[in-house]
Curated annotation (Swiss-Prot):
Induction entry: Expression is induced in response to DNA replication stress.
Top-rank taxon, per record: Eukaryota
Leader sequence residues: none
Protein name: Cu(2+) suppressing and bleomycin sensitive protein 1
Species of the source: Saccharomyces cerevisiae (strain ATCC 204508 / S288c)
């Protein structure tokens, strides 16, 4: 996916590449079935084996292309994803690598080189859209730069692929190692090429930022913020459905209840009130007018700090100002909390709003899974929408460019959310994810108890003791195994979480004992009989604790 958005490639496959295409289609189909299979968890060995087999085919494909075409340095470059030779094989291969990358994340191998492919693809799309929009700040770029540096370190590592040392006599492991050694150069070239492309895109964006005079940076930041606010306001609503649409959908609902029972007929989740739009729009318009008044007679912006005019960056700032005025005009004509665009653009707008809303809901939990939340499908949908553009614009018969910037913003926003979801992935295998979720919940509850002042007696902690004991009993000699007897990724994280929960629990118990002793001392000074009763009660409370510790 090295081509810029909207660029089309010939899909004619040379005869010598047809066998590889058929193999990749089979792999893509099997991976698609795998992510729909909810009966068993992914196995890291299976994922690693499939990945190495695909790399072997990639190596064969590279050799075929090098033998068929003149290359400056045949041994030092790869022709995979070459813009000139791009065909259907490359498109299917990209799908396979995307799926495999998500599989590596699913089995908890987040910090392995293959797992970075999906992240790099999303960063690549995000950077291309930021470049087209010309609306970004250092705050937008700094997280991307940090992530690219992290990926660089992973790719630079000699042993980028994880080693499995559970059983040195395992034939499958030896097979993986042999394949890895043969494919190491090809894997390295592919990832480095994709990483270099992202870095080049980033450097272009960083260079654009430096074109603006530092004294105008505050003005630029405010204009960016206003424009983002306007775009966000436009993208937060969906056109209200008419009564006839609702009646039609009611009939469809009866026929397809199983498929659509989770969706509202009126799509209320997308709607915002007209009052809200007007209120937010009024605030942003006032901020825009205030900034606009900070210009000289010739229309050049002054520095907010020194009140001096700097020449460098004036055209960029005035361009941002014009964009903001266009968006204000669009929002002023909104009806029923929604935006009506060109008939050719409206379906794209509706589709992007749906995708964005779904992805934003996922951000609440900061968790995705390969089967329950298929990020690959969302990436494919976004790519399909992106590829409809011609010369950066969505095709329409109208000469009015209204809506183009809004659609691009929605695309960019969706890519950004997918990027955040990928980065929020924990290096824990899906086989251990239920245990990880339970431990995280127990930890959160214990921390909340501690924050609210602890408990009055140890009995209140018994449910947490029992839960932690049951989770601790799932280990065998300190290791969590899956149902097939394998050792999934994420052992360190789970053991650290379990130990932290026990530590917090112990602190709460100590605090509860101190409270009980203080209460006993206070009662004893008033009434000796009550004091003896309190001591007896305290000693009774301690018995279950000793049983738990012995257990």
């Amino acid at each position: 996916m090295f081509a810029s958005a909207g660029q089309q490639h010939p899909q004619i496959v040379p005869k010598e590449e047809e066998s590889i295409l058929n193999y990749l289609l089979e792999v893509r189909s099997s991976l698609a079935k795998l992510k729909q299979n909810r009966t068993q968890y992914l196995n890291s060995k299976d994922v690693q084996t499939t990945y190495q087999h695909v790399l072997t085919k990639v190596r064969e494909l590279d050799d075929i292309r090098k033998n068929s075409h003149e290359t400056p340095a045949k041994s030092a470059a790869t022709l995979i994803h070459s813009t000139e030779l791009h065909n259907r094989v490359d498109s299917v291969l990209d799908d396979v690598f995307q799926l495999l990358s998500l599989c590596f994340l699913t089995v908890g191998l987040k910090n392995s080189a293959p797992a970075t492919y999906a992240s790099l693809s999303t960063v690549e799309s995000l950077l291309e859209h930021l470049n087209e929009s010309n609306v970004f700040t250092h705050h937008d770029l700094s997280p991307i730069k940090e992530r690219l540096e992290e990926i660089s370190k992973i790719v630079e590592q000699k042993n980028s692929s994880p080693a499995y040392d559970e059983d040195g006599n395992d034939d499958r492991l030896r097979e993986i190692d042999n394949e890895r050694k043969k494919n190491k150069i090809e894997e390295d070239l592919l990832l480095r090429a994709k990483l270099k492309h992202c870095k080049d895109e980033y450097d272009i964006l960083e260079g654009k930022l430096e074109e603006i005079d530092p004294s105008l940076s505050t003005v630029m930041e405010k204009l960016f913020r206003i424009r983002r606010g306007l775009l966000s306001l436009v993208a937060s609503a969906k056109k209200t459905m008419s009564k006839s649409d609702i009646n039609t959908n009611s009939l469809l609902q009866e026929q397809n209840d199983l498929q659509t029972n989770n969706e509202s007929l009126t799509d209320d989740k997308h709607l915002v009130s007209q009052e809200y739009v007007h209120e937010k729009l009024s605030v942003l318009k006032n901020e825009l007018s205030e900034l606009e008044s900070n210009r000289d007679d010739s229309g050049k912006f002054k520095s907010l700090e020194s009140h001096q005019v700097a020449e460098k960056g004036q055209s960029v700032l005035n361009g941002l100002l014009d964009d903001c005025h266009d968006l204000v005009n669009d929002l002023s004509h909104q009806k029923n909390g929604g935006l009506t665009l060109d008939p050719y653009l409206q379906p794209i707008y509706e589709q992007l709003i749906d995708i964005k809303t779904t992805l934003e809901n996922l951000m609440i939990t900061r968790r995705w899974t390969l089967r329950e939340t298929d990020l690959f499908s969302y990436q494919k949908k976004l790519n399909e929408i992106d590829n409809k553009r011609i010369n950066g614009k969505f095709p329409t018969k109208s000469q009015d460019s209204k809506g183009q910037s809004i659609l691009l913003y929605l695309l960019r926003r969706c890519y950004a959310i997918i990027y955040k979801l990928l980065e929020s992935s924990e290096p824990v295998s899906e086989a251990l994810q239920p245990i990880h979720n339970q431990l995280s919940t127990v930890r959160r509850c214990l921390l909340e108890l501690k924050r609210m002042g602890g408990v009055n007696n140890e009995r209140e902690l018994y449910p947490y003791q029992m839960k932690l004991a049951s989770l601790d009993n799932l280990r065998t000699e300190g290791i969590f195994y899956d149902s097939d007897g394998n050792i999934p990724e994420g052992q360190g994280i789970l053991n650290a979480l379990l130990a932290e929960c026990f530590d917090i629990l112990h602190e709460l118990k100590v605090e509860a004992e101190e409270k009980a002793q203080n209460s006993t001392s206070s009662d004893g000074s008033d009434d000796d009989d009550n004091g003896e009763s309190g001591i007896d009660s305290n000693s009774n409370d301690s018995e279950p604790e000793s049983e738990y510790q012995q257990e």
